[in-house]
C-alpha cells in the first residue's frame, strides 16, 4: 500500500509512520533523509540538488520529486511505502501524479493548534546526550536534569511557542490545501485526535482496512 501522512508539525506523524512501517513491513520515506542520501550517493538528481543547496537556494519541486522517484524504484518499496513530509504543496502533489507515482491512501492526523503548541512547547532535550523529555507526560526525575547523563535539559528553538506558531501558520498556508486536493480524489482518511499513541494507531489501522 502506498501511503501519504499529512498533519501539522507535532501531530505525531513520525511516531505513527514508525508503527505502520513495523506492522506493514514497508519503509517510511522523508524528504530530508532522501535528499541527504541522494547527495551522499552522488545520484543524478542528488548532484542537481547539491548545486542548489551549495548556493543556499531551495531545492526545486521537480528535483525533490525526481529524487523521490529514484528512491521509490528501490526494492524495499515493492510492497508499498509511507511518504512523510512530501508532498508539502499542491505543486508537489501534482508533480507526483504527473510522474505516475500511485498513491492509495492519504491519512491526515487531525490535531488542534492549541494541543500542538502545548505538546511541542513542553518538549525538553538534554544538551549533552540528546535524550528527550516532556514536562507533562515524560518528566525527568529532577526538573531540568537528564536522567541518563545528568546534563541540562533545554527547550529547542523549534519547540518555543512563537516558533511553533510560525510553523503552524506555514503548514496551514502551504500544506493544508492538500487535504482538499486528496479529498477530491477520494483518497483522504481523516484520523481524529486521540489522547494516546495506541488509540491513534487503532484509528489509523481502521482507516487502512476501510
Which residues does each PLM region occupy?
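Glycine-rich phosphate-binding loop of ATP-dependent small-molecule kinases
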Residues: 1-210
Amino acid at each position: 500500500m502506498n501511503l501519504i501522512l499529512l498533519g501539522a508539525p507535532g501531530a505525531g506523524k513520525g511516531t505513527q509512520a514508525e508503527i505502520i512501517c513495523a506492522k506493514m513491513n514497508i519503509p517510511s520515506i522523508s524528504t530530508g533523509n532522501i535528499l541527504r542520501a541522494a547527495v551522499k550517493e552522488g545520484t543524478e538528481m542528488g548532484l542537481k540538488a547539491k548545486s542548489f543547496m551549495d548556493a543556499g537556494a531551495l531545492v526545486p519541486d521537480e528535483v525533490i520529486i525526481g529524487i523521490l522517484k529514484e528512491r521509490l524504484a528501490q526494492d524495499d518499496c515493492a510492497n508499498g511505502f509511507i511518504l512523510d513530509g512530501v508532498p508539502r504543496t499542491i505543486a508537489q502533489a501534482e508533480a507526483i501524479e504527473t510522474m505516475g507515482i500511485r498513491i492509495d491512501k492519504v491519512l491526515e492526523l487531525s490535531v488542534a493548534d492549541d494541543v500542538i503548541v502545548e505538546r511541542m512547547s513542553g518538549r525538553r532535550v538534554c544538551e549533552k546526550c540528546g535524550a528527550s523529555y516532556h514536562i507533562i507526560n515524560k518528566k525527568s526525575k529532577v526538573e531540568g536534569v537528564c536522567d541518563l547523563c545528568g546534563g541540562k535539559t533545554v527547550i529547542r528553538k523549534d519547540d518555543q511557542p512563537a516558533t511553533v506558531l510560525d510553523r503552524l501558520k506555514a503548514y496551514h498556508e502551504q500544506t493544508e490545501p492538500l487535504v482538499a486536493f486528496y479529498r477530491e480524489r477520494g483518497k483522504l482518511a481523516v484520523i481524529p485526535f486521540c489522547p494516546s499513541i495506541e488509540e491513534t494507531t487503532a484509528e489509523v489501522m481502521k482507516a487502512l482496512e476501510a
